[in-house]
């Protein structure tokens, strides 16, 4: 295959891989290749020896009433709630009914560049409700608990809210512990059985959200539509798995229960942010469901058996905040995988680490992208230089190529043979010009996901009109400059001998300008910087080669 054919194929491959394949791969095929451990009706006959004697391995039938019940958002009264403010949470409200967290805004993350209001991650706003709750199931029956607040205690940078309530002979004390600088909330429940009979209790920690999957549609011209929205979970049997809301909506209203033993977690993921319940018991079971229209729920339930006049405690952690690896890695095994860079995450994590180090020095993510690009070009300079020298030699051979084409224009087989003989004689590899592009493909894809998924770049400004590197250039200046740079780069490369190839190559800058117009401006900045450096390198090397190899 001719070198120009391969160049065209590689360019098209980049577009296809970015736009068609990579954008949906992680949603279509789970990251973990192991067989799914899910089942819709799972009976458990064995007891797991937990470190906490009070917990019991609850069967799905015991939790059936809770699993088949849809959350009613309307029952929570905003007026009957306790408000908490920390360094990271603003107006976090805990309802006195069931102790549900019905709203929480993130102090450090505004709604948009134009609206500096803290973004509401959890909300009780009608039509877009998203809450975290802990339901109590007594003897297989879910109950509502009307709590009373015992006040908030502040000490050592922490706030502790205590709620007390009673129902069906059980006295319940629930505490919420907030570290002022962290997004994780420790939830501890002490339940005392004041009756004369043993009581079976299930604690169902769950997330519930009103979400329309139809609105989460994929668009070629919206790079952010490639991101994942749905449920993620981790168990002892399945380290990390994702299920999109769109796929869950096709489960015909049946709850899915994951049969697992050992520590795990369950989460709702959206672009840049995650809410996750992390039970502290080895006997918790994970589930997710979509029983009613657009209400999606996911949670972890844990069973405890309480003897008469005895009390038992059970703990869990709720994380609700940005997807930042440093925040998640110590909370639970595999929780940091919610920062999912896709199949090339290994390279993406290296690129982000280097970018983050540079950003800590220069204080601007745009400059960090430019400097990372320069560093990448420096690392691969020996390969690029070899490629550009080969292309310069190919360019000098163009007159001979044209003569061969004129001589053997009626016999393409002989023409191909003669050209290969010429390349061999001149020690030229016609495919070497494709090497820089091959190298760029994994780097391009890795950086693409870094820019798309890293919350650190959300609303990160560059200069002048670029106020958010994670969004497209509002005036399309960078895509146009990138298209011009591609055109100039073509002019330095050997011209295709085939007129059809020449036309295709001529239109590629236009096509890519159109495609990149919807990409994050940070990604376009990388590609533009890469092209400019490549043009300078190629021009200098070509000029030097021609000057030293004149015949």
From Swiss-Prot:
Keyword terms of this UniProt record: Cell inner membrane, Cell membrane, Chaperone, Membrane, Protein transport, Transmembrane, Transmembrane helix, Transport
One GO BP: protein transport
Keyword GTP-binding part of the UniProt annotation: no
One Gene Ontology term, aspect cellular component: plasma membrane
Subcellular compartments: Cell inner membrane
Composition bias type Polar residues, residue spans: 44-61
Bias (Low complexity): 30-43
Transmembrane segments: 3-23, 361-381, 431-451, 504-524
Pfam families membership: 60KD_IMP (PF02096), YidC_periplas (PF14849)
rRNA-binding listed as a keyword: no
Membrane topology according to the record: Multi-pass membrane protein
Renumbered residue ranges of the record's region Disordered: 30-61
Source taxon at top rank: Bacteria
GO molecular function: membrane insertase activity
PANTHER family named in the record: CYTOCHROME C OXIDASE ASSEMBLY PROTEIN COX18, MITOCHONDRIAL, OXA1
Functional description taken from the UniProt entry: Required for the insertion and/or proper folding and/or complex formation of integral membrane proteins into the membrane. Involved in integration of membrane proteins that insert both dependently and independently of the Sec translocase complex, as well as at least some lipoproteins. Aids folding of multispanning membrane proteins.
Family: Belongs to the OXA1/ALB3/YidC family. Type 1 subfamily.
Quaternary structure and partners: Interacts with the Sec translocase complex via SecD. Specifically interacts with transmembrane segments of nascent integral membrane proteins during membrane integration.
Protein name: Membrane protein insertase YidC
